[in-house]
From Swiss-Prot:
Pfam families for the chain: Cys_Met_Meta_PP
Family: Belongs to the trans-sulfuration enzymes family.
Gene Ontology annotations of biological process type: methionine biosynthetic process; selenium compound metabolic process; transsulfuration
Pathway: Amino-acid biosynthesis; L-methionine biosynthesis via de novo pathway; L-cystathionine from O-succinyl-L-homoserine: step 1/1
Keyword tags: Amino-acid biosynthesis, Chloroplast, Methionine biosynthesis, Plastid, Pyridoxal phosphate, Transferase, Transit peptide
Assigned EC number: 2.5.1.160
Residues passing through the membrane, by range: none
Organism of origin: Arabidopsis thaliana (Mouse-ear cress)
Activity vs pH: Optimum pH is 7.5.
The name this protein goes by in its record: Cystathionine gamma-synthase 1, chloroplastic
Primary residence: plastid
Mutagenesis or variant effect for residue 77 to H: In mto1-4; over-accumulation of soluble methionine
């Protein structure tokens, strides 16, 4: 049967494009995110940002690799994850309008039309009948082994000559569903038919002809080019995180510190000024206090609740960025994100919130007014203590600036690590629910225990920002910090008496983790220096995993009885 009788099914929706939209240049990143109003923070600018180039787009072209149907039937059913490179890398979305197709290609299409099997055409026609859509007949280019399907798409929103649906995840009403399906549910089936996202292990991507390369360089088409600039597996992860944060764009990197440092270097000019808070991750503080001054960048440090101090700083200095955690590490202080964003934006200051302790489920910093959100994806987002990663979420413009520098500095996330995070995120909502619950219940128990002198947890009324946390968070997190009623030796005995948690420097995973910050993070400093940061020898930070609450409770209580 002739190719012209083929009708393209609805799998070519606008939602399907972003999952494997090739993005190697910084201005080709990001896409609109659907969902509730809380998540649609930057949607207006993002819709048109997914497609760039000088020519108007009247169609989209998917290029299948040689013998695609045969490969799919033989390999995909047997081992979808190993199809990866050949089929995904070969799938390129072209910006060339259909009218620009060369006459030679048109002739090739005509000559090869009869080679398409009637069975394939019938199956396609059946799919089209089940889900009708305004479609143009496909065009086959070059040979029977390389099909290029050109399809007009359902009209909901039209920008120029590109037709897009107005809501990418309109059928997903909760963050829990987004953690499972965002970035994956739509679109990938046209490449592998695999439920899970394939891992694309390649360092570079090839162009079949020099003309393709020139089209790419002159932005008439988009494609992956080099592994440091983008990867199909990594793009799926970025889209999933963007959906949760309500961001136009997300950039993933090799670690949380990589994300923080590249963000600071990209957005704060030499001679600029930063405002941060007293309580924060020590390595972040070291970078700001020891390395940024070499670029002439100065830092003002304020208490997380010191709004007057923030106003004084932005009025006195030309502040480029306000950067803090919320909740903070290790005392879980909370910053009024909405208020500080209003104060900073009046003076042209950007706001970046490290939301690692909150997760995108417990707090939507972009919806509260922040310009950027940083996460150590090593923690809750990955959630299994088996991968290092970091991410930056925000507007397309800001993330693109950071991506530009990232392409130069490196720190690229390995696609295997990206896959582990994608898989881990499918249970993020379940894990966080359990961790929120266990942490809250244990915080109440610890606060009432005679051998605990103080508990730091935003879910407790005794916390200085408890009312603020109730306003801007939907859950209080899975980490509780507390002080044992005793000295460092007593605290060590408590920690060593625990049987369930690991003594380790991380948090947010399925396994419970405990540490003494005075030893784990500040042991190189004398006690008087540690006290400047509020780090007492009897301070304990406990990250609750997903173990049964009663087991964890019994373990902590027996350890307290042992001291």
């Amino acid at each position: 049967m002739a190719v012209s009788s083929f009708q393209c099914p609805t799998i070519f929706s606008s939602s399907s494009i972003s999952g494997f939209q090739c993005r190697s240049d910084p201005d080709l990143v990001g896409s609109p995110v659907g969902g509730s109003s809380r998540r649609r923070v930057h949607a207006s600018a993002g819709i048109s940002s997914s497609f760039t180039g000088d020519a108007g787009l009247s169609s989209r072209i998917l290029r299948f690799p040689p013998n695609f149907v045969r490969q799919l039937s033989i390999k995909a059913r047997r081992n979808c994850s190993n199809i990866g490179v050949a089929q995904i890398v070969a799938a390129k979305w072209s910006n060339n309008p259909s009218s620009a197709l060369p006459s030679a290609a048109a002739a090739a299409a005509t000559s090869s039309a009869s080679a398409v099997s009637s069975a394939a055409s019938a199956a396609a026609a059946s799919s089209a009948a089940a889900a009708p859509v305004a479609a143009a007949p496909p065009v086959v280019l070059k040979s029977v082994d390389e099909e290029v399907v050109v399809a007009e798409e359902g009209i909901r929103e039209k920008i120029g000559s590109v037709q897009l649906t107005d809501s990418k995840h309109s059928f997903l009403s909760s963050d829990g569903s987004l953690t499972v399906h965002a970035g994956e549910r739509l679109g990938r089936g046209i490449v592998t038919d695999a439920i899970t996202t394939p891992v694309v292990n390649t360092s570079a991507y090839f162009f079949k002809k020099t003309a393709e390369l020139i089209d790419f360089k002159e932005k008439r088409s988009v494609s992956f080019e080099y592994g440091r600039y983008g990867n199909p597996t990594t793009v799926v992860l970025e889209d999933k995180i963007s959906a949760l944060e309500g961001a136009e764009s997300t950039l993933v990197m090799a670690s949380g510190m990589c994300a923080s440092t590249v963000m600071l270097l990209a957005l704060v000019p030499a001679g600029g000024h930063i405002v941060t808070t007293t309580d924060c991750y020590r390595k972040t503080r070291i970078f700001m206090e020891n390395f940024l001054p070499k670029l002439g960048i100065t830092v003002t440090v304020i208490d997380p609740a010191d709004i007057a101090g923030l106003e004084a700083a932005v009025n006195e200095f030309k502040v480029s960025l306000f950067f803090t955690e919320s909740p903070t590490n290790p005392f879980l202080r909370c910053v009024d994100i909405e208020l500080v964003s209003k104060i900073c934006h009046k003076r042209g200051t950007l706001v970046c919130i490290d939301g690692t302790f909150a997760t995108p489920l417990n707090q939507k910093a972009l919806a509260l007014g922040a310009d950027l959100v940083v996460h150590s994806a090593t923690k809750y987002i990955g959630g299994h203590n088996d991968v290092l990663a970091g991410c930056i979420c925000g507007s397309l413009k800001l993330v693109s600036e950071i991506r530009n520098l990232h392409h130069v500095l490196g720190g690229t996330l390995n696609p295997n690590a990206a896959y582990l995070i994608i898989r881990g995120m499918k249970t993020l909502h379940l894990r966080v629910q359990q961790q929120n619950s266990t942490a809250f219940r244990m915080a109440e128990i610890l606060e009432a225990h005679p051998k605990v002198s103080h508990v730091y947890y935003p879910g407790l009324p005794s916390h200085p920002e408890h009312e603020l946390a109730k306003r801007q968070m939907t859950g209080f997190g899975g980490v509780v910090s507390f002080e044992i009623d005793g000295d460092i030796e007593t605290t060590i005995k408590f920690v060593d008496s625990l049987k369930i948690p690991y003594i380790a420097p991380s948090f947010g995973g399925c396994e419970s983790i405990v540490d003494q910050p005075a030893i784990m993070s500040y042991w190189d400093l004398p006690q008087e220096e540690r006290l400047k940061y509020g780090i007492k020898d009897n301070l304990v930070r406990f990250s609750f995993g997903v173990e049964d609450f009663e087991d964890v409770k019994a373990d902590i209580l027996q350890a307290l009885e042992a001291i």
